[in-house]
Amino acid sequence: MRSDMIKKGFDKAPHRSLLKATGLKDEDFDKPFIAICNSFIEIIPGHKHLNEFGKLVKEAVRAAGMVPFEFNTIGVDDGIAMGHIGMRYSLPSREIIADSVETVVNAHWFDGMICIPNCDKITPGMMMAALRINIPTVFVSGGPMAAGKTSKGEVVDLSSVFEGVGAYQSGKISEEELKDIEDHGCPSCGSCSGMFTANSMNCLCEVLGLALPGNGSILAIDPRREELIKQAAEKLKILIERDIKPRDIVTEEAIDDAFALDMAMGGSTNTVLHTLALAQEAGLDYDMNRIDAVSRRVPHLCKVSPASNWHMEDIDRAGGISAILKEMSRKEGVLHLDRITATGQTLRENIAHAEIQDKEVIHSLENPHSEEGGLRILKGNLAKDGAVIKSGATEVKRFEGPCVIFNSQDEALAGIMLGKVKKGDVVVIRYEGPRGGPGMPEMLAPTSAIAGMGLGADVALLTDGRFSGASRGISVGHISPEAAAGGTIALLEQGDIVCIDVEERLLEVRVSDEELEKRKKGWKRPEPKVKTGWLGRYAQMVTSANTGAVLKIPNFD
């Protein structure tokens, strides 16, 4: 066993003595040591219940004849961090999480790991660590939150609350109505109830094969979560016995399938960023062109909030992720069904008995929302290395208009609230990329303000930053190269005409190459917004969004 490094041999007497101080007995040294990587944090509603989850996981691990050791990671609640400097720490926290898990697991030579994530950056951070460490691992997330209902019976979620701010600001609803939405938008523990980033990543974790069937859709408050925990411990023991590791599971084909599900469900654009980062950790050569190829062959079968009024509980009721995958498998070439997963079985075996229970929620191949996926990769002279749009969250497929430029999210939000943006405009928010932000903050507040003011179909928004999974409308993010790297977005001037063509996958500014080259010669990179602390270091090390915004390792040659 891997853990023999710290528990076998006469020279490990000091190690065993320390381990006995934690409560271990001599007989425990013949059992696998299992890391329970938890993320219990009281300020994050998606993680508030994970303390109890951790106890259940440890009980299940002991029942399976193994020895559990629980530790915790940090986390950031993107909703609470939204709209201020806290959001700049969100994406960088992914790297800290990955590094901290690597540190604890490799320092103590665990034989296997069960990860308990739930929200936005915690799930991908732990997944990156699992691929980096590469010991048998199973994920069990905390589960989605239920949708809420206002006093009038209207179904609401966190996206409704953000959009309610814009609606109140523009006089569309009263303060009392806003308070009603606020009070009911987040009714329980769990990851926010729509197809936002957290749920998108937990669903992708399931199809990648790192989590068990049901992981993405079973609600946090559903007793079936406890059964999932028991299964996770049992399956982990099998993975250890068969020496099946994350890199055996997360192959190029598995990433294809993850993006295929993403396209079928119209997931968060953040999945592109995080899954590209996973590919980097797995040592795979996977780029945005391959994502685009997946998008072209996968139909859009589900619309979940913010693209509709359906929520994760509806997906679960309609058959869950397995039912979506089973339907997708009917189309040749969409999925790789014979690859291994954390169940110890193939994807084909995992979904064999799944069926769609409600075709209003999960559409059939014969009745898709669209013939192509709910996310699209755009390219053009404004995004030579690519950009991402959640095409399933807007009915507008082509938009052209003059750009209104803001050099920060705060500046943009103030401008939107002051009425500086009108119908037909293209809002540009730049210098908010991985390096320029720093931290590539999400633009939920501006997109929600635009939607809440009734301009969601009449105003486009472009950024080198990110969008929350709760964002909707004509929102193009992850523009690469970013402004801080001298990308074309940095060269735009007020009033330049920008064209977004979703069907043709184009993002262009109507300015000649000669004029852009002239502007570039006169461009100067702004001073970094942050020069000290973690964000200062992050800004110096982070790479582009089109490679997952991972950190580059300095060249010591």
UniProtKB/Swiss-Prot annotation:
Residues binding Mg(2+), per UniProt: D78, D120, K121, E442
Cofactor notes: Binds 1 [2Fe-2S] cluster per subunit. This cluster acts as a Lewis acid cofactor.
Cofactor dependence: [2Fe-2S] cluster; Mg(2+)
GO biological process, one term: isoleucine biosynthetic process
Biological pathway: Amino-acid biosynthesis; L-isoleucine biosynthesis; L-isoleucine from 2-oxobutanoate: step 3/4; Amino-acid biosynthesis; L-valine biosynthesis; L-valine from pyruvate: step 3/4
Role according to the record: Functions in the biosynthesis of branched-chain amino acids. Catalyzes the dehydration of (2R,3R)-2,3-dihydroxy-3-methylpentanoate (2,3-dihydroxy-3-methylvalerate) into 2-oxo-3-methylpentanoate (2-oxo-3-methylvalerate) and of (2R)-2,3-dihydroxy-3-methylbutanoate (2,3-dihydroxyisovalerate) into 2-oxo-3-methylbutanoate (2-oxoisovalerate), the penultimate precursor to L-isoleucine and L-valine, respectively.
HAMAP family with a match to the protein in the record: IlvD
Name used for this protein in its record: Dihydroxy-acid dehydratase
Organism this protein belongs to: Bacillus mycoides (strain KBAB4)
The organism's taxonomic lineage, starting at the top: Bacteria, Bacillati, Bacillota, Bacilli, Bacillales
